[in-house]
Amino acid sequence: MDRRVWGALGTGAGLAAAGAAYATWVEPRWFALRRVEVPCLPSRATSVRVLHLSDLHLVPRQRVKRAWVRRLADLRPDLVVDTGDNLAARDAVPALVDTLDGLLDVPGAFVLGSNDYFAPGLKNPLRYLDDSHDRPVRTGAATPGQHGPGPADPTDRGRLPTEELLEALTGRGWVDLTNARARLEVAGLRLELVGVDDPHLEYDDYGVVAGPAADDVDLTIGVTHAPYRRVLDAMSRDGAGLLIAGHTHGGQLQVPGYGALVTNCDLDTARASGLSRWWPGAGSTPSAEAPDDAAWLHVSAGLGGNPYTPFRFSCRPEATLLTLVPAR
């Protein structure tokens, strides 16, 4: 083998090592604030700013992430919507409350994700590429009238302190939308919010909250952790004008010029993150073909990930400031 071949192999190995180091140590800490305008309000409504947080997967030692999220309070949003997966460690709730402290003084609403119930575990990242991750994870039926599987056994190391998390968030005034409906008046607008428990664990019970959007509000917002089609279809069919979700991590590893390879649910990869349109039966139909009355869908790429698979490439961790404006 001549020197040119050895040189090419060495260059390739060096680039691969550099890419792996970047995806492990640089991009996961390179947080981005996205600003997105959503034309979903009635014609005479004033604009309202909604900060969408998702998938913090917080471990107390993550000082860079915590400092960045704290500064989001300086944006002074009108409303905060948190689409779940807040925790990645059993001792993370106090750190989460400290991190969100300024934002907890703002009106807020939230739903839960799987990593608000169960601690993350070691997984082969290649498993996310098979079709099984398009389907929900079966963990056993949710307990009627309770969140997910019900109260955690303190001796179960696989369970996270869900009750402590709920008390911390609702104790500061945020609204729990887990299989629930609520109304908020924000910046002079009357908002109806409809949420479900995590569809990825099949804890969603949309039947509890199903029904037409109220006719005496300015906007109905559907909130879910995992954007499974069945939930998006039901919410948009009932008249929600805006759907907000997380869970996908934006695919976490994107191919430049192509985009996400996976969504970890049955949502198409073109909608893995960002703003798109959704309507009942949309499936993988492009947003450009949406009917005029289609809902707007925002999926966050999230702020974190499973600590055992911390990689990101071409998919920076993010929070999004959604400015809701009158429809054009």
What role is predicted for each listed range?
Residues 39-51, 174-175, 181-193, 219, ...:
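Beta-strand-turn-beta hairpins that frame and shape the catalytic cleft
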Residues 8, 15-99, 119:
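N-terminal active-site segment of His-dependent metallophosphoesterases
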Residues 51-54, 79-85, 107-114, 177-179, ...:
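Active-site neighborhood of phospho(di)ester-bond hydrolases with catalytic His/Asp-centered motifs
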Residues 227-321, 328:
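Conserved beta-sheet core of the metallophosphoesterase superfamily
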Residues 64-185:
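Core catalytic region of metal-dependent phosphoesterases/phosphodiesterases
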Residues 212-223:
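Short beta-strand/loop segments at the ligand-binding rim of alpha/beta enzyme cores
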Residues 1-12:
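Membrane-penetrating hydrophobic segments
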Residues 47-66, 86-89, 118-132, 157, ...:
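Acidic/histidine-rich helix-loop elements
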